[in-house]
């Protein structure tokens, strides 16, 4: 799914109105119907609803929503905010329609009026500005937003929380911003929804589809994408009846250190679960028994050193390499990693301590094989590129690092992002807070190795690995819960995640 900036969404609206064709007021009606369906499915009629309506099309959505909910039997109060003399044509039409519904109480509020209190029992709907405002909220309207935020009511924002900057960091926004519990956005997720710094404004968000013209969506060139099942399913390769283990590649995992052999175990098992024909784990010799016992399906290559990675094995037999989980940053390991980079042209997966070593030796980075994959968490990424002023700045640094070095950067988080050498960036839709547990990243590294070994392009491996990793985590959370979820639970659900992509049921939502 494409993530359109606000100016492109406006173009999509205009294109739809012109080419469907459909009137602006009818497109607004379509959006309000989707909102109404969500409210009726999630909010009981026993809860009265208070809608704050602005003077633009976001306000028009609010007036139309109030009318539809009143017709369903909800108790509706609307507060029409008179911060200007102008009202958009479609908003004016829905304002007049709402006025004709006797069951709706409409209160006009202007800059000189005392603000009425917000009853505690009401669910508040923010239909003030949505995504249409690009300047900070000040003055009279700031008082309205502040009053809503200071209440303890549930707040539902339409399209985007009012005052929220969708396409730039809100760390530079000195105005008031609605702090929503739920945000119902139209057709596409907004770019700003995907960053931790904005969670307190956006809350839980959902995309409501309002039928914007598919020709525009297909043709518009966009760099940022939001990964859904439909994006990933076509990438899966069908297995041949007469294939054998050699068909699906041989992955080399260089991992593990004294006290951290579990990282190597998790990654090796995940690599096999992700479909690699063979996985060899190159580990310090002290870990041999652990690996052979914990993952008997994997082969073991023992390092000359008992506790550290000190020398890479012959690389000629392998289709893909991953390095880093539990490795440590000993000087021996640093030297061995440098030689590894010099002695292969295979795209590699760099994780954990391999990234930390490169962070200490940045002059090595230009020699990393093109199309390699980096999988840092935010702190590891900071060691590579330095501090960022905000989440948007960090995303720009991530994209620039990928472009400059011709690599893929998977920045792990709630919406794990994949920055590609061509400038595109993919944000993940799967995963959950239960995956914030030790070893989760090692599982991802193993999955990436297993997928790469099968001959997938690194970009495909990144997309499939990240999406399937999160999906396996979602299945694990549904079985064990967030608190009890451990990394090996994610591994146990990799097969089920693959089945989701390879076996679409009739009538299933893609």
Task: Say what each PLM segment does.
Residues 82-85, 161-162, 354:
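Short beta-alpha junction loops
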């Amino acid at each position: 799914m494409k993530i359109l900036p606000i100016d492109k969404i406006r173009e999509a609206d205009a294109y739809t109105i012109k080419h469907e064709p459909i009137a602006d007021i009818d497109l607004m009606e379509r959006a309000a119907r989707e909102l109404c369906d969500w409210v009726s499915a999630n909010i009981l009629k026993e809860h009265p609803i208070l809608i704050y309506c602005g003077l633009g099309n976001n306000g028009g959505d609010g007036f139309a929503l109030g009318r539809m909910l009143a017709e369903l039997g909800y108790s509706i109060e609307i507060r029409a905010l008179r911060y200007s003399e102008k009202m958009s044509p479609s908003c004016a039409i829905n304002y007049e329609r709402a006025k004709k519904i006797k069951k709706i109480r409409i209160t006009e509020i202007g800059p000189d009026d005392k603000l009425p209190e917000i009853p505690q029992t009401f669910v508040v709907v923010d239909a003030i500005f949505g995504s249409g405002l690009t300047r900070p909220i000040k003055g009279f309207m700031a008082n309205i937003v502040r009053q809503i935020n200071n209440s303890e009511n549930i707040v539902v924002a339409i399209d985007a929380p009012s005052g929220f900057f969708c396409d730039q960091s809100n760390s530079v926004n000195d105005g008031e911003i609605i702090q929503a519990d739920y945000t119902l956005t139209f057709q596409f997720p907004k770019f700003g929804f995907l960053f931790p710094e904005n969670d307190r404004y956006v809350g839980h968000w959902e995309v409501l589809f309002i039928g914007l013209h598919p020709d525009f969506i297909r043709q518009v060139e966009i760099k940022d994408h939001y990964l859904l099942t439909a994006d990933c399913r076509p990438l899966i390769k069908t297995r041949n009846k007469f294939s054998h283990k050699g068909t699906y590649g041989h992955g080399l995992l260089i991992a593990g250190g004294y006290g951290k052999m579990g990282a190597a175990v998790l990654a090796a098992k995940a690599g096999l679960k992700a479909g690699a024909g063979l996985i060899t784990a190159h580990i310090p010799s002290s870990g041999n028994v652990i690996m052979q016992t914990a993952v008997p399906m994997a082969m073991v290559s023992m390092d000359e050193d008992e506790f550290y990675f000190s020398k890479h094995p012959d690389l000629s037999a392998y289709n893909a390499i991953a390095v880093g989980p539990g490795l440590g940053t000993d000087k021996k390991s640093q030297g061995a990693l440098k030689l590894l980079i010099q002695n292969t042209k295979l795209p590699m997966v760099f994780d954990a301590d391999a990234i930390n070593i490169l962070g200490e030796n940045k002059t090595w980075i230009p020699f990393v094989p093109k199309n390699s994959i980096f999988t840092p968490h935010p702190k590891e990424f900071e060691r590579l590129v330095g501090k960022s002023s905000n989440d948007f700045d960090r995303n720009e640094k991530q994209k620039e690092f990928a472009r400059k070095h011709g690599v893929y950067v998977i920045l792990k988080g709630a919406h794990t992002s994949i920055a590609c050498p061509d400038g595109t960036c993919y944000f993940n839709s799967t995963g959950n807070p239960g995956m914030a547990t030790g070893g989760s990243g090692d599982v991802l590294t193993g999955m990436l190795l297993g997928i790469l070994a099968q001959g997938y392009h690194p970009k495909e491996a990144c997309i499939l690995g990240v999406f399937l990793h999160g999906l396996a985590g979602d299945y694990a959370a549904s079985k064990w819960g967030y608190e009890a979820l451990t990394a090996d639970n994610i591994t146990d659900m990799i097969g089920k995640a693959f089945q989701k992509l390879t076996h679409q049921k009739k009538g299933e939502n893609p």
